[in-house]
Amino acid sequence: MATDGASCEPDASRAPEEAAGATAEAARKEFDVDTLSKSELRMLLSVMEGELEARDLVIEALRARRKEVFIQERYGRFNLNDPFLALQRDYEAGAGDKEKKPVCTNPLSILEAVMAHCRKMQERMSTQLAAAESRQKKLEMEKLQLQALEQEHKKLAARLEEERGKNKQVVLMLVKECKQLSGKVIEEAQKLEEVMAKLEEEKKKTNELEEELSAEKRRSTEMEAQMEKQLSEFDTEREQLRAKLNREEAHTTDLKEEIDKMKKMIEQLKRGSDSKPSLSLPRKTKDRRSVSISVGTEGPLTRSVACQTDLAVESTEHVKKSPLTVPVKPSPGSAKGSVGANAALVRPGIDRQASHGDLIGASLPTVPPASANRIEENGPSTGSPPDLTSSAAQSPAAAPHGLPPAHGSQSGSQSPCASAPPHSAPPHPGLNPRVQAARFRFQGNANDPDQNGNTTQSPPSRDVSPTSRDNLVAKQLARNTVTQALSRFTSPPVGAAPRPGASPTGDVGAHPPVGRTSLKTPGVARVDRGNPPPIPPKKPGLSQTPSPPHPQLKVIMDSSRASNAGAKVDNKTVASSPPSSLPQGNRVISEENLPKSSSPQLPPKPSIDLTVAPAGCAVSALATSQVGAWPAETPGLNQPACSGSSLVIPTTTAFRSSINPVSASSCRPGASDSLLVTASGWSPSLTPLLMSGGPAPLAGRPTLLQQAAAQGNVTLLSMLLNEEGLDINYSCEDGHSALYSAAKNGHTDCVRLLLNAEAQVNAADKNGFTPLCAAAAQGHFECVELLIAYDAHINHAADGGQTPLYLACKNGNKECIKLLLEAGTDRSVKTRDGWTPVHAAVDTGNVDSLKLLMYHGAPAHGNSLNEEEPESDASDLDEGEESSEGKSKPVVPADLINHADREGWTAAHIAASKGFKNCLEILCRHRGLEPERRDKCNRTVHDVATDDCKHLLENLNALKIPLRISVGEIQPGNYGSNDFECENTICALHIRKQTSWDDFSKAVSQALTNHFQAISSDGWWSLEDTAFNNTADSDIGLSTSSVRAIMLGSVPWSAGQSLAQSPWDFMRKTKAEQVTVLLSGPQEGCLSSVTYTSMIPLQMLQNYLRLVEQYHNVIFHGPEGSLQDYIVHQLALCLKHRQMAAGFSCEIVSAEVDAGFSKEQLVDLFISSACLIPVKQSPVKKKIIIILENLEKSSLSELLGDFLAPLEIRSTESPCTFQKGNGLSECYYFHENCFLMGTIAKACLQGPDLLVQQHFRWVQLRWDGEPMQGLLQRFLRRKLVNKFRGQMPSPCDPVCKTIAWALSVWRQLNSCLARLGTPEALLGPKYFLPCPVVPGHAQATVKWMSKLWNAVIAPRVQEAILSRASVKRQPGFGQTTTKKHPSQGQQAVVKAALSILLNKAVLHGCPLPRAELDQHTADFKGGSFPLSLVSNYNSCSKKKESGAWRKVNTSPRRKSGRFSSPTWNKPDLSNEGIKNKTISQLNCNKNASLSKQKSLENDLSLMLNLDQSLSLGSDDEADLVRELQSMCSSKSESDISKIADSRDDLRTFDSSGNNPAFSATANNPRMPVSQKEVSPLSSHQTTECSNNKSKTEPGVSRVKSFLPVPRSKVTQCSQNTKRSSSSSNTRQIEINNNSKEENWNLHKNEHIEKLNK
């Protein structure tokens, strides 16, 4: 019930609320809040609050009610007092219903479940508690451990602190020790340096000792050689004495035989027999005597055994007129005598040759030996020049009895006795005429002409005399008999068989004939190739020599054949050396061994005058063979020598003589005047000549043919070729044919003979080499040309694949290469190793050969096959363009250039690995070259190249871009800038593909730095050396910071800037042809471009600008041509832009001052330009720059006198009043914004102009001080660098010498003009800036100098000297102040001064040769004045000085302690002239004059009286000297009338003594002279010294040399001197105590005077 009631309560409570709400709504419709009163509002508020509280209460009641309803619904069924009972009752009441379930869960089960849960939770909590306890225990353990660790940490920290303290102490100790050790190290280093210095000294001493020891060793070896020489000479003398003994024995036996024969003759005469035998017997007996004594009759007095002799007249007449009949076999005595003589004389010669390899001394005094291998033709090898002179001296006495001395000692045929002692004299004067006849008969026929030099083109004439043919066999039998006897003992020892065609010594000489031959130079008788030899005279009477039996025959050897007629041995050729004349006019050939050059040049052929004995041929002609000689009765070349007969070539060539004995054709009596008889086909006597009886048979014909071809014996070869059945193609063991041997040795005539005889032209040896191969390899281009003409196979390859072209390239034979290429040979033939001719040419490094291979046959506008490689002179900008090979395309294909051998190496690999840069450069010019081609070891050309070649390869594809410096627009020419250049090329930049912008920027910066250093350095060293030699003093202040911008073509670029493309691609794409560097100029407020243009250091220009900005009034003055106008205008321009950059407006006003420029015009200029403003007007802000040019043309004091104070104090406090044109005057003043600059072309101020000096700031441009002193040198250096495209030529280059000469001319001119006391004639460097720089043409510079001299220098000097001579004269002599027309004396002075200046300052040091210089001297005005009027040149003949220019010292020279030097007291005059003068007081008494006499004879002594004025008298020469003296040293007047003419040499000058300026200093003459003194402005007393002995020329008065006196010659004199009487030798001078003398010393080197002695 309660529930029901409870549930009804809410409904009951809602009803009144709803009723109240309904009434409220009804009331609200009529209710208006705004109309309520305050109390009503309060009541309303309270009602509403109560309503809210009621609402809260209702809410709470509703909540409680709902809670009760829930509980009732949930638990209302049960009795709360006994819930279990109620449940049981309810259960039991419904027990019948089995399916009935409890209403809710049993509370007991719920409790059990709760208890179970609680137990689980308890267990879980217990486990967690146990775990927590264990964790707690662990934590406590860890805490304990942590505490222990902390304790240990504290202990360790304490230890660490202790250790740190200890370490600090150790470190301090170590620092102290280091300091001590460093000190010790320094000490040890010093000691080491000392020890090293001592070591260097010891090394020097050791080196000196080594040099001394080596010198001693050389001396000892020389002494040893001399001893050996003497021993050999003693052996020779011993053998000669033995020979003499043998000859005496033989002579005895001959005399016995003659006695017997004479007895028989007497018997025959008694019997009345026929007279013919009686006529022939005396001749025969004479000849027999001659034979028996024919070998070595000279003994120790002659050099040659088989020497040509001149017979006595009787003997020679017999020889000429009668035929000679000789028995076939000689008598035993004769043979024995000959054997003994030869045996005695052969051995010492050979021994001596073995001990002295250089037996080739000069036997002709007029022919100095060219080398140790020189071969003397006419006799001994070891002879000395005195032999000839001694022989010539004894010739008159020796001629009647023996041979002429020249023949005896110099022109004998080759003999074993060629090594005679040096003291050889003519043969024994007492020799029997029969001995001479015998010598002539069997030896003298060595005069027969040599056959080597003749061609077979024209058969010579032959003697058809029947007598000669009939008697040929008999004479030859006789001679061959003697030959057999002689040849036994003139041969080498048995078993020493020589190589065929060569001598044991490896040198085969060409032997000219013996007889009256004369030496001539090769050029005299040289004929063009192909000319036939001239036909010789047939008559003996044509001989022009005094010896009757020797008709002279002149044979001109063909100039086309090589003179090395022998076989080539050891790669040496025989060349002709310059011959000389013998006393009797005999001509021989001298030859020398020359090393084989890479491109052989065959020497010209000498001409030989051959004299032939008509009576027959000499024994020695066959017994002593040579190159081209024909050995008679000798075994074959390859057979060993035997006792009976042997080859004699080793004996003759062992002495390296080059006497040509006669070969076979001249062995006929009738063929004495025919050289190539058998060449014409007629040789009737060949068989008896070759096969005459003897102990050994002759060798086979083929061997003899090869020997003749190898030796170049044309005559023997022609005879052999005329034989029938001879195999001319026979080959020896090596496969060498006769044609091969002749071609290999360069015997063109033999080659032509063999080819005409149809020899096989392509016959190859066992290695496959043809004659063409041999000739090409040896460089015999004439043989090559001949073989090619006879269709030789030009592309024949030997067994190794070598073609003639390959062999010629391998040996560098340029002419042969050219001939083969012209013949169309194949360049691409490869050897077995894969090498081509290009490989061979590159392997030897022969540039000419490679050029021929590359370019020969190219279509040619630029084909220069035979031209030299263009010199890498100036720069590499145009290397490829300037070289002519670059203009023509190579003819070889790319495949041939890139062909690789078996190792994979191309020609470029070979050239690069061997460092042949020139060859590699030529190869690189071929566009098909593949430098990246790799060999079999995978190496490129760059990998195997040397450093130089690597650099070349790296630059192969590099772009060469010229780098130029531009200074922009140069101001108009009236500013003095006509000679300046806007752009200068400084170098070439190599831009490669891998070049980065950083590299490019560094290269530009480095090039600029090098260039600035190069042009500012003092010397002529190269650009690479400037970094080491440049000093701060010579630096002009330019660097990379001076660059305003850089233009790559037309694209601007700044240093360090990186573009998208690489520099290489950028340059190629934009087609930039140059890189231009723009320097900062006045437009940027900088002066860098002005510095570079004018070469004035930047620091000095900045100082000038600072002076202008600071002082506002600056005047620049210096000699004319000192660039004052240019400097002023550039400074004004820079100042203007600076002011404009600062925000001011600025204007430049320029005015040229002339003689008519007045002060009123200047006032108008100042006022119109707002520089002068009225006092009432406020100052203007505008900047005005006034430039007054050429102020020297007006008086400064008159022009600027009224402006001095206002200019110095620029304010209204110092006004100046000027009258206007309307007559009114007004006050003006100069404001602070006005700058005044002026220029004066004058070296110094004078007179009233000095009053202006203190009111201006002056900039003096001295010619001998910076910036003018080094300006010209720097400017010309820059000009030279620009001319040579950025490169600095070598100091020894002629261009550098020319530039140095032009520079010295300017300096010496100014130096001499300053000494002359004419500062108004001084020249600035501007006149010399246009000096032409023309490489290789110094004449252009000399011509330019002559024009400058005539147009500028000479007129200025003339005007200055005349102005000096026309200054006011003293009134007592009636002289006018000026002279419109100079007198003759003054004209002479001008001419003399011009001549002296020209010779001493201009022509001195000229790089032209003296001959060319003499031609140009006439172009100089005043150069023809005779210096003998001024100086005495007679001593030149004694001193040998007539052609030498005297040197001039232009540099300031300090005073020596031995000269007395007064101090000048004129400070205002310290700005001009030479800084130092040597002022000396001379004691001119007799002894002093004598001591100075020589120096006064040689030099121009300008010792002058400067207080006393000189006058011109009637004598022009005296006037000239005196006036020139006053000109050269004095600023004072040289009065003409002061000096009277005196006949004697005594000239006395009185000291004026009235000059107060020098009165104080005269008493102290040893006071030092200031370096800034100006001696030309001072006054001195003139001292003259001369010598009477030196006469110049007839008609000229005695005028002494007034050239500069060396200081070493000047005698210091005492101050107190007395007048001495004049003598014939000296002029005595009276000198006062107060007089001063000046010595003008122009010698730069005083040792010249010593040389003149």
Swiss-Prot record:
Record has Coiled coil as a keyword: yes
Modified residues (Phosphoserine): 1514
Quaternary data: Interacts with CTTN/cortactin SH3 domain. Interacts with STRN, STRN4/zinedin and MOB4/phocein; this interactions mediate the association with the STRIPAK core complex and may regulate dendritic spine distribution of the STRIPAK complex in hippocampal neurons. Activation of glutamate receptors weakens the interaction with STRN and STRN4.
Coiled coil regions, renumbered to chain: 119-276
Native organism: Eulemur macaco macaco
ANK repeat start-end pairs: 700-730, 734-763, 767-796, 800-829, 833-862, 903-933
Sorted UniProt keywords: ANK repeat, Cell projection, Coiled coil, Cytoplasm, Methylation, Phosphoprotein, Repeat, Synapse
Gene: CTTNBP2
Region (Disordered): 1-27, 203-222, 268-297, 314-339, 356-609, 860-892, 1441-1472, 1545-1653
Any one GO CC term of the record: actin cytoskeleton
Subcellular localization, as worded in the UniProt entry: Cytoplasm, Cell cortex; Cell projection, Dendritic spine
Ranges annotated as biased composition (Polar residues): 379-389, 444-470, 478-490, 573-584, 1549-1564, 1572-1589
Compositionally biased residues, Acidic residues: 866-883
InterPro entries (UniProt xref): Ankyrin_rpt (IPR002110), Ankyrin_rpt-contain_sf (IPR036770), Cortactin-Actin_Reg (IPR050719), Cortactin-binding_p2_N (IPR019131)
Chain positions with Asymmetric dimethylarginine modification: 488
Job description of the protein: Regulates the dendritic spine distribution of CTTN/cortactin in hippocampal neurons, and thus controls dendritic spinogenesis and dendritic spine maintenance. Associates with the striatin-interacting phosphatase and kinase (STRIPAK) core complex to regulate dendritic spine distribution of the STRIPAK complex in hippocampal neurons.
This protein's name: Cortactin-binding protein 2
SMART domains: ANK
